[in-house]
Amino acid sequence: NYYSRGVSPFIKNMFDSNEINGEAWSRYAAGYMWGITGIIYNPDAVSKEEASTWTIINNSRFKRQITIKDNVRDSMFAAIGAIKSDKLTSKSFLASKDYKEKLAQEMNDTSDDTIKEVQEYLQEVKDNAYSFETDSAKADMITGKVVAGYQWSGDAVYTMDQADKDDFTLNFAVPKESTNIYFDGWVMLKSGIGGNDEKKQAAQSFINFLSKPEN
């Protein structure tokens, strides 16, 4: 099929090597796309330096002019990056021999103290942000309602391309503290397929259609 013949080596490796409950992702999911998170911004209003840190989400200079993602994983990730910014960007931390492992521990810290600190920080962010959103920030950036937004890289590219058509420049910055890699994938739900061969074939055909290079 198109997916097995055309899946990128990078996605195949990631889906083969990562597991949930002892099963590789590739056992039940077909990779669709991947990317990172960062800050899309208007360079006429926001400097690259200001956009290159998670602390921008609570920067009062952009009060009611920045959007944040409306989901737990992304908002908590950004908040942890902002709260721990000084530590994560310190020379001693960056020079650690086990830097990747330490960074993963810090960014995935779910201790009671950190959760409480994140909750309090996001309450402040709520007062500073234009909105917590999932999809509306693309239009808000293009129309100039906001000057910056927490964005997935795929949506950021789309937004920048649309802005270019209007001779309007937008840029994308990766926060210096850390970013995260996301993977989107397709799965067939057992409750939806339920041993129905026609539904299974239809689902597989849909995934194959999306996996065609021209699509």
Model-derived segments and spans:
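Extracytoplasmic ligand-binding site segments that recognize negatively charged/polar headgroups
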Residues: N1-N128, E133-S136, D140
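A residue-level structural signature of the nucleotidyltransferase/glycosyltransferase Rossmann-like core
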Residues: G31, G38, V147-A148, N180, ...
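Residue-level detector of short, conserved catalytic/binding motifs and their immediate flanks
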Residues: T37, R64, V147, D184-W186, ...
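Local beta-strand N-terminus motif with an aromatic residue
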Residues: F62, V146, D166-L170
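Paired acidic/hydrophobic, glycine-rich loop segments that form the ligand-binding mouth/hinge
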Residues: Y130-S131, V147-W152
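Alpha-helix capping/helix-boundary segments
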Residues: A137, D155-A156
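Extracytoplasmic/periplasmic substrate-recognition and gating elements
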Residues: Q151, D155, Q162-N215
